[in-house]
Amino acid sequence: MSDCWCFIFCKEHVRSNPLSPQHDGASREEADHQVDVSDGIRLVPDKAEATAATASDEIMHQDIVPLCAADIQEQLKKRFAYLSGGRGQDGSPVITFPDYPAFSEIPDKEFQNVMTYLTSIPSLQDAGIGFILVIDRRQDKWTSVKASVLRIAASFPANLQLVLVLRPTGFFQRTLSDIAFKFNRDEFKMKVPVMMLSSVPELHGYIDKSQLTEDLGGTLDYCHSRWLCHRTAIESFALMVKQTAQMLQAFGTELAETELPNDVQSTSLVLSAHTEKKAKVKEDLQLALKEGNSILESLREPLAESAAHSVNQDQLDNQATVQRLLAQLNETEAAFDEFWAKHQQKLEQCLQLRHFEQGFREVKTTLDSMSQKIAAFTDVGNSLAHVQHLLKDLTAFEEKSSVAVDKARALSLEGQQLIENRHYAVDSIHPKCEELQHLCDHFASEVTRRRGLLSKSLELHSLLETSMKWSDEGIFLLASQPVDKCQSQDGAEAALQEIEKFLETGAENKIQELNEIYKEYECILNQDLLEHVQKVFQKQESTEEMFHRRQASLKKLAAKQTRPVQPVAPRPEALTKSPSPSPGSWRSSENSSSEGNALRRGPYRRAKSEMSEPRQGRTSSTGEEEESLAILRRHVMNELLDTERAYVEELLCVLEGYAAEMDNPLMAHLISTGLQNKKNILFGNMEEIYHFHNRNIPAGLESCIDCPELVGRCFLERMEEFQIYEKYCQNKPRSESLWRQCSDCPFFQECQKKLDHKLSLDSYLLKPVQRITKYQLLLKEMLKYSKHCEGAEDLQEALSSILGILKAVNDSMHLIAITGYDGNLGDLGKLLMQGSFSVWTDHKKGHTKVKELARFKPMQRHLFLHEKAVLFCKKREENGEGYEKAPSYSYKQSLNMTAVGITENVKGDTKKFEIWYNAREEVYIIQAPTPEIKAAWVNEIRKVLTSQLQACREASQHRALEQSHSLPLPTPSSTSPTKGNTRNVKKLEDRKTDPLSLEGYVSSSLPKPPEKGKGWSKTSHSLEAPEEDGGWSSAEELINSSDAEEDGGVGPKKLVPGKYTVVMDDEKGGPDTLAMRSGDMVEVVEEGAEGLWYVRDLTSSKEGWVPASSLSTLLGKSSSAQCLSSSGKIHCARQLCPEPAEILSPEPV
C-alpha cells in the first residue's frame, strides 16, 4: 500500500567515559530485555524519512539500560545509596551514601546493580560532567571508611568528579583517620579525588545546602519511597509505550500487506476484522495515555500542594520524560489515525466497488434477458383484439421491467457518485456506468419501437375492422330490404335512399387506397397481414359492387312508369296447386329444380311464392338470400374463432398465473397446508386441454375462414381428442370441493392481484366445461345457415359427435356417483344410456304378494344401460353446493344382457316398455318420463341385443340360415302364421304372440345366463318390496302389465315412423310415387304436408313420397308390438287384424 508507515525507535549515542568500567558480558546479554525510560516512539513515513531522525527527537540514552527499578526494587529499598536530585556547583549529579552499618555486607552484584542504575538516571549531559559522591561515615570506623571508599571507587560505573567523605566524629576515629589518610593520600588520589571532611558545614562549602538532604544539613526535600514509586511508574509507562509502538508496527504491517478481496462478503469480513483490531489498538493507546497523565499528575502533586515547594533537577527530568512520552504517544495516535483513515477509506471504497460490480452483473443479466424477450416479440397481431392484447402484454412487461431499469439507472448514478468522490477504481467504474446507460437506453428504444409497431398494427386493424364492419352492415342492409316492397315505386325510392345514405358513410369507413396502406404500414405488413388486407379490400370492393348493382336496379324501379301495368295471367305451372300434390308436379320444370330438391328434403318446407315477381327478381332474391346466409356463417365463424383464441389465452393465463406459481418457492409461504401437493386435483388435465387447443383448434379454424361451412371437417378430424374433456369433467367435483375448502387462501388472492383478474379462479376452472357445451351451440348455428352447402353433412356429423361427447360426459358424471357396486364398472362395457324411471316388477313363479304390491307401488329407479348389463340404482339427492349437490346412486341389482329380452309396447301407456329376464321368469315394467325417452331406450336396447345376436350368428360357422328375417302378417283368409313359421301360436300369460323361432342361429357356444347369485355382484332377481313413495293416483298407473295386448276394442292406429315389410304389390301407385312390391323392406321416415309420407325402400335404396290416402284405410286398425331377446330367439308379437287390406307390416328385427 502507498503511504506506508513504519515504526522506529530513536535513541542518543552514549559518550564514552574513561572513568567508567566496561560492561560485563552478562550486562550485554540482558540489554535486549530492558527498557529505558528515555525510549521514545514516533511514526515516520517509509524508509526515506527513517534517516531523517535527529538528536532532537531523542529523549535519553541510546543504549538500552540493563536494569530498571522494578528489577532491583528490593536492593534500592535498602537505601545504602540514593540519587536525591541534588547538583554540584557545575551541575554534577550528587549520589549520597548515607550511614549504613551493613555496607560492607552488601554483595558486590547488588552494589554494582544499584550503582549502574543510579548513574543511568541523569541525562547524558549531566552524567558527562561527572558524579559527586557524598559518603556519610560519621558514625563509622576508619577501617570501614577506607573499605567503602575503595569499593566505591573500584565499582563505580560512571565518571567521578569528586568524592566527599564525612569522616568519623569520634575523637579516636577522627585522629586515626587523619593519620591514616595522610599516609594513604596518594593511594586515594590515584583512584578518585577524595576529600575528607570533618563536619557538615565543611560539606556545605562544596555543595550548597539546597542541594543536600536534611540528614546532611540541607533543605532538599527527598523521600526515598516516593522516588522509588515514581521511578517504577515512569519505567512501566515507558515499557507500555514501547509495547504499544510494537503493536502498532505489527498492525500497520498487517494492514499494509492485506490484499483487497474480490467479492462483497470477503471485503466486508476484512473491513470488519480490521475495524475490530483498530478499536483494540485505540483502546491500548488510550490506556497508555491515561497511565502517562496519571504519572505526570503524581510528579506535579508536591508543587500543587505547596507553591513554595522547590523542585530538584531529577524531578524536572522525570516530568520532562513523561511529557515527552505522552507527546510521542499523541503524535503516534494522530499518525495512526491518519493511516487508518486512509486504509479504512480504501477498504470502504473496495466494498463499494464490489457492491457496484455485483449489482452491475445482476442488472446486466436482467437487462440482457429483457432485451432478448423484447427482441423475440415480433408478432404484430392478427386481429384488433389480438393487437390490444399484445399492447396490454407489452405494457405489463414494461411495468415489470421498469424495476430493473430503475435499478440500473440508480446503479449508474451510484457509480458516478463514486467517481466524484475520487474512488481509487475510477478506470473500472466509468466503463460500467456507460454500459449501464447504454443498456437502459437500448431497452427503452426497443420498447418504444415495439410499441410503435403495435400502435401501427392497431391502427391498421382498426381500419380493417371498420371496413369489415361497414361491408357487413352493407350486406345486412341489402339482405334486409324486402324484395316485394321494392317492386313498387315508393318502396324502390325508399330503398334507394337507404342505399345512397349508406354509401355516403363509406368515405370515413372504407379503405381508400390500397397502395397507400402498403406504403404507410410497410413496417408491419407480413405475409398473413398482407393477405388479410387484400381480403378485406376485396370484400369492400365486392360490397360496393353489390350496392351499385342494387342502386342501378332500384333507380330503374323508382323511375316513373309511362304506361299502366297490364294484368298478366299467371303461368299454369306456377299456379297449379293440388290438395294432394305429387312429387312430380314440383319436378316438372327445369327452372324450379331447386324447389324440387327442397321439397324432396321435406315437403313441409313451404316454398316462397314469387308468382308476381319477374324471373330476374326471383334470381336476385335467391342470390341475396345466399349472401345473407354467407354473412351469417362468417359471423358464426368469427365468433367461433374469436372465442377460441380468448379461451386458449385464458387457459394459458390460468396455467401460468396459478398452476405454475404453485411450484414457485417464493409463493410457498402463501399456500395453505390443505392445498399443498394438490395441483393436479385443482386443475385436472387443464394443461393437456390447453396444448390440444393451442396446437390444433385455432389453426384448423383459421383454415376455414374463407369457407365457414366446411368447419365441420375441422371438428371431425379431431373428435377423438375431445375425449380429454371427459377426464376433466370427472375431476371437476374434486376440484370444486378443494376450491371451496381453500378459496380464501392468500395464494389465490395474490395470484388474482398479479393477473389483474376481476373474477376468481373458480370462474376460470369452469371455462373448459362451458367451452365444450359452447361448441354444440355454435355448430347448430352454423348448420342452420349451411343446410344446402357442401359441408352440411360434416356439420351435422360434427354436431352429433359433440352431442355424443356431451352425453358421454354427462353419463360418466352419473356413473362415478354409483355407490355400493362391488365389481368393476369398466367390465360392464361402454355406458350407453342412463335415466330415471318408474319400475314395476312381476314374478311369474310365486311371489304373488310382491306382484300385487308391484302393481300399485312403483319404485323409482335410475337405470344404467351398459353393453353387458343393465344396472338398477336408487337415486339419492345430496345437500350442498355445486357438485356436492349432485345426486348419488345406491346400487340395487343388475341384469346380464345375455339373458334379457324386451317388449317394446305395453298396452295402456305409450311411455311403458318391458324388460324380462330368463324367459320371462322375471318381468320389469319400465315407465319413461316421455315417449321419446322410451323410444330412445328401446332402440338402444334393441341395438345391444341385435349386436349380441349377430355375434352368436358369426360364432355359428357350421350352421346354415334356415329362417327368413321377415314374415308377412296374416291375410283376412288366413290368421295362422305364415308358411315359413313352423311354430304354433302360443299364448303367454294373457298375451297373444306370434313367436318366430331362430333356434337354428344359435351355436353351442352361445353364452348362457348366469345362475342366480353367480357372475354378477349383489344381483338379486327377487326385486325388493316397493317403496312407500305414495302419490300414485292415476288410473293409468294401476294398469296391470298383462293388459298390454288384450284383444278387442282397438280402433285404427295412426301410422308412425319405422321399418315395415310390404306384403302385396301396390296396385294404386301413380307414376310419380314410389313403387312398392310384395316382400320389399321399407322405412317410413316422416310425414310431410298435403298428406304425403316420405318412404325409403331399403331393398332397392330408392326414396320417394307415398300418398297417405292410399295407406290410411290399409293401416287403419293395425298395431304392432315387437319384443326381442338376444338369447337366440326373436319374437314378433302382433295383434291379429280382421281388416283385409293391410299392405305394410312392422319389420321383425
Curated annotation (Swiss-Prot):
Q: Which residues form the DH domain?
A: 632-812
Q: Which UniProt keywords apply?
A: Cell membrane, Coiled coil, Cytoplasm, Guanine-nucleotide releasing factor, Lipid-binding, Membrane, Phosphoprotein, Proto-oncogene, SH3 domain
What's its membrane topology? Peripheral membrane protein
Q: Which InterPro entries match?
A: CRAL-TRIO_dom (IPR001251), CRAL-TRIO_dom_sf (IPR036865), DBL_dom_sf (IPR035899), DBS_PH (IPR035534), DBS_SH3 (IPR035532), DH_dom (IPR000219), GDS_CDC24_CS (IPR001331), PH-like_dom_sf (IPR011993)
Q: Which residues carry this modification: Phosphothreonine?
A: 622
Task: Describe the location of the PH domain by residue ranges.
Answer: 841-950
- Pfam entry (one): Spectrin
Keyword Ion transport applies: no
Q: Is Nucleotide-binding tagged as a keyword?
A: no
Indicate the principal place this protein occupies in or around the cell.
cytoplasm
Location(s) in or outside the cell? Cytoplasm; Cell membrane
Spectrin repeat feature ranges: 351-456
Coiled-coil blocks? 503-529
Q: Which GO molecular function entries does the Swiss-Prot or TrEMBL record give? A: 1-phosphatidylinositol binding; guanyl-nucleotide exchange factor activity
- Distribution of this protein across tissues and organs: Expressed at low levels in several hemopoietic cell lines and in thymus and spleen, and at higher levels in other tissues, particularly in brain.
Domain CRAL-TRIO: residue ranges:
52-224
Give the similarity note. Answer: Belongs to the MCF2 family.
**Quaternary structure per UniProt?**
Interacts with GTP-bound RAC1. Interacts with CDC42. Interacts with RHOA. Interacts with CCPG1, which results in specific inhibition of its exchange activity toward RHOA, but does not affect its activity on CDC42.
Please identify the protein, giving its name as recorded. Guanine nucleotide exchange factor DBS
Q: What is the scientific name of the source organism?
A: Mus musculus
